[in-house]
Amino acid sequence: MTIQATLLAGADVFGTVEIKAKKCLLTYGTSPCTASLNDAQACFKTRNVLNDCQDIPNYNETNVSYFFCDEKNTEVIDGFRPLLKNVSIAPSKLPARGGLANVSKVKFTFIDEPDTDTDLDDNILDRSYIARENGTFWGKFKARNSFIQGQEIVYSVTFYQSNGTLSKLNQRYQIESISWPNKNGEVTITAKDPLNLTDALNAKCPPVSRIKLYSALAVGTNHLFLDSVVGIKSPDNLTIFRIGDELMEVDGSTYAPQPDGSIKLNFTANGRGILGTVHAVHEVGATVQEVARFDALSIDAALAKIFNSYTDVTSLQLDTSGWSAQVSAWRSSSFLTNYISEPTDIKTLISQICDQNQVMMWYDPQTSKIKLKAVAPELGTLKSYTDANDIFDLQVAEDDTLRLNSVSMYLNPRSWIGGNKPSDFQDVAVSLDTLYYDLYGSPKERNLYSRWISSTPVALSTTGVLINRFRASPFRISFKMPYDNFPQTRLITGDNFRLETRQFQNATGSSYVPEFICVSTKYDKDMTLNVEAVSYSYFGGNNGPIGATSFDGQDYSTYIAANPNAGGILAWISQADGTMLNGDDSYYIT
């Protein structure tokens, strides 16, 4: 429903809420609905605990929206209930070192009031009570919508831009819970982004097994019998199982139901005791755990497989084309392999992939998409701001907790059912800070244990990025800025940008303009943008592609011309004759 500009007279900002719920399309007692009670006892066309649908097989679901505006609104807006009291948003925040963002959480507070039910109950005229004298809106809403968790709630802010243009900002979340009215008649709806809903990230990969051995399994046997295959979610034809401490591979194409109700599957050639485990005898009734397998997948493909196969997050919420573009540009050498035999929280696995490959993942409530971006320099034109013209309330601090002087990544596990100690891995990749290691007085180290990365050069890329970014204590900043009318300069989470301020000076006292990564954004009620960011200090080089078709269309000549003071951001590869594209002598790494 559109808010008309005439309703905004005297107000600069106007907030509304839309709750999207489910409802049956059918008319009570009319075919195909077979419910047969009288209309006074008709259902409320929703699935609920207390007054459920009376003909569940024919329940025909559709979406229905409920609209709310501010309780203090003096204009009557058709279809909007003036029950909204307050909206409190805790935005998603990216880890400073890259990885999976923390939860974004929104609390909507509503007042409650009696309600006539005229637009909610199709059978209101047949009821034996007067709706306005019986209960309240939220009490009845909650009783009629028992299964509202996961449904979408949209917070919309309509406002005038500084140029007088009417604009609207929508932020979409998913409902986690609705409280019962408290003693003051207030109801709280808690909503979160889809990355962090209980059913999404507390799901397990692989799922906890419900499968048992139907008969004992001897050493050397080339097939096994299962009591069922219920709950297996592997999309792979060649499925790996774990029984006890043995991993084994079966050929899904040999699936054969037996007369006794069991399921027979054949092992692949040499399919027993694989991946660092050994053959063993297994008793009847032993648990057969599906293994989630990832065979040399790109970062975006591995993440997509986790979301699509093991969570209820929909494919429409995944910005997979954006993921692919980032991975192709910056992490194309990373191919991930893992065999997960213990049910593990989805959030843990996504965090591992993001952290160990230096990519960031977060939910954008304005596009309703889960975004991914590599921790990398911005090769295009950086957004740039100053405290003289663009921002206010700037706070600056150095965060020594982020400093790193040594990063080690242990990789290639000796066994895929082993632990996460250094001795459980075959290889280690180490990057050291040789510039400032002992100058701070207390060198800081970090160890990563990766069951995803199998390439030492890729591991060294991650450890190198971390050292190059955090060998010096980075800046953490926060500031505010007005709403930007122009999308091309509007700051959003994940953006790289530069900030010029009197607070940043070099040793000569001249202006120093560092680069930052925006880790969090939130709009206030008055559309003031609150920003948190961490400095992007990069002392090493990312390899820049050869030729004019490099990332963002820039070659060596145009990049150097546009960024004369950006030395160290890119390490450009010379031509075959040893010169750079503009004729300069090539660089030497010493």
Q: Could you describe each region identified by the protein language model?
A:
Residues M1-A40:
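Intrinsically disordered, low-structural-confidence terminal and linker regions
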Residues M1-T2, A40-C43, N48-F137, A143-L169, ...:
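C-terminal extracytoplasmic interaction modules
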Residues I175, V250, C518-S520:
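Conserved hydrophobic positions within beta-strands
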Residues E246-T268, I353-D355:
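Polar, enzyme-active/binding microenvironments
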Residues G261, N270-V278, L394:
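Periplasmic N-terminal soluble interaction domains immediately after the signal peptide in Gram-negative
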Residues H282:
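Beta-strand/loop-dominated core regions that host nucleotide or nucleotide-derived cofactor-binding catalytic loops
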